[in-house]
């Protein structure tokens, strides 16, 4: 055994399903996780839309080491952008409504990870899905607080580059 875990996307999604997000709404559109271990304020989207986007984000890029707060931070970027972009706000709101309709209820309430995966697979070429996915690439992976959880030490250009820092010292590649 090499000390690394081999987890399939399906296994990660099933594990994520066990901790589905339950959205609560407080003053100012406060959205919190099922155990209130994280909270974010939805300023421009309603709390249910925000919470669904967090669950959708986790299902799109599942990482067992990442807490939901990292996904919520990425969704906050979309929420802020929706303030000045009415078309984006409509896209997100309508996209979540469509996802909920396809799920036969709240997408974030679907406990079967395979069903959630199938629902996302059905819309993967849609502009809504692509917008959320694209936002995650930067919103999730540019989050410096998440880097240690991925085993990434951060940028090295200001420290002489990887060649001078031991470019082969990473074990996750």
Predicted regions and their residues:
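Residues marking the start of alpha-helices
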Residues: 3, 41, 106-107
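N-terminal secretory signal peptides and thylakoid transit peptides that target proteins
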Residues: 2-21
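C-terminal segment of N-terminal export signals and the immediately downstream linker at the start
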Residues: 7-11, 24-63
């Amino acid at each position: 055994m090499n000390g690394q875990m081999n987890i399939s996307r399906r296994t990660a999604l099933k594990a994520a399903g066990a901790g589905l997000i339950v959205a609560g709404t407080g003053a100012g559109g406060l959205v919190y996780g099922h155990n209130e271990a994280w909270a974010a304020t939805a300023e421009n989207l309603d709390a249910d839309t925000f919470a669904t986007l967090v669950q959708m984000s986790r299902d799109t890029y599942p990482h067992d080491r990442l807490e939901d707060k990292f996904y919520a931070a990425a969704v906050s970027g979309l929420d802020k952008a929706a303030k000045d972009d009415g078309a984006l706000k409509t896209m997100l709101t309508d996209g979540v409504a469509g996802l909920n309709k396809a799920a036969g209820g709240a997408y974030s309430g679907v406990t079967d990870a395979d069903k959630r995966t199938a629902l996302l697979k059905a819309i993967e070429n849609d502009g809504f899905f692509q917008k959320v996915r694209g936002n995650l690439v930067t919103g999730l992976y540019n989050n410096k607080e998440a880097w240690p959880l991925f085993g990434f030490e951060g940028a090295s250009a200001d420290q002489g580059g990887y060649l001078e820092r031991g470019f082969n010292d990473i074990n996750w590649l």
